[in-house]
Amino acid sequence: MTKFSVVVAGGGSTFTPGIVLMLLANQDRFPLRALKFYDNDGARQEVIAEACKVILKEKAPDIAFSYTTDPEVAFSDVDFVMAHIRVGKYPMRELDEKIPLRHGVVGQETCGPGGIAYGMRSIGGVLELVDYMEKYSPNAWMLNYSNPAAIVAEATRRLRPNAKILNICDMPIGIESRMAQIVGLQDRKQMRVRYYGLNHWWSAISRSFRKG
């Protein structure tokens, strides 16, 4: 089976170890030969990367692991880019959420005025990653789940229409799982769900139970 090389852009994120564990849990379907982290904050990334190095050494020592702040090193010889960046980091997220609340409107990182502000900041950073990928590994695909997903997806569609990029969000799956728990089911797949809305702002969920 073909083994893949992946770079996680946003390697300094506290969510990155979860991505590593997810990748390791799916080695039977998506085997890795190499895993790299990339971040423009070297100090922050080092803390996360050293922790992940321990995980990989214990669970998958055959996977080559490295981390860097150099785009050429990070994006060369990769098959997939997994991008989850937060432009402005948590200090700006705090402003995105608190400023709208002072004016009596939704204060949320992907919705309302804060979501628009965060989206405008995110576009440039995500496009930069797309350009690095296309320059150093033109055959690679990007899985982008940098928020706000809808704004970023539309920006990449308009500004990089030929880029090999999938913009995704796991919030609908998370909501389905919580709903399944509420109604006493063991798994969200025991429901048939129709989801209306975008990512963190959904208007309705309808469900029907499977027979048997």
UniProtKB/Swiss-Prot annotation:
| UniProt-listed Pfam families | Glyco_hydro_4
Q: Where does NAD(+) bind?
A: 4-70
List UniProt keywords, sorted A-Z: Manganese, Metal-binding, NAD
- Membrane-crossing ranges are none
- Gene Ontology MF terms: hydrolase activity, hydrolyzing O-glycosyl compounds; metal ion binding; oxidoreductase activity, acting on the CH-OH group of donors, NAD or NADP as acceptor
Q: Which organism is it from?
A: Escherichia coli (strain K12)
Residues annotated as binding Mn(2+) are C169, H200
Q: Which InterPro entries match?
A: GH4_Enzyme_sf, GlycHydrolase_4_CS, Glyco_hydro_4, Lactate_DH/Glyco_Ohase_4_C, NAD(P)-bd_dom_sf
Please state which protein family the record places this protein in.
Answer: Belongs to the glycosyl hydrolase 4 family.
One example of a Gene Ontology biological process annotation: carbohydrate metabolic process
What is the protein's given name? Putative inactive 6-phospho-alpha-glucosidase
Q: Which SUPFAM superfamilies match?
A: LDH C-terminal domain-like, NAD(P)-binding Rossmann-fold domains
Q: Which domain of life is it from?
A: Bacteria
Query: Which PANTHER family does the UniProt record give?
Result: 6-PHOSPHO-BETA-GLUCOSIDASE-RELATED, MALTOSE-6'-PHOSPHATE GLUCOSIDASE
Other facts noted in the record for this chain = The GlvG polypeptide of 212 residues cross-reacts with antibodies prepared against the full-length 6-phospho-alpha-D-glucosidase (MalH) from Fusobacterium mortiferum. This operon may be cryptic in wild-type K12 strains.
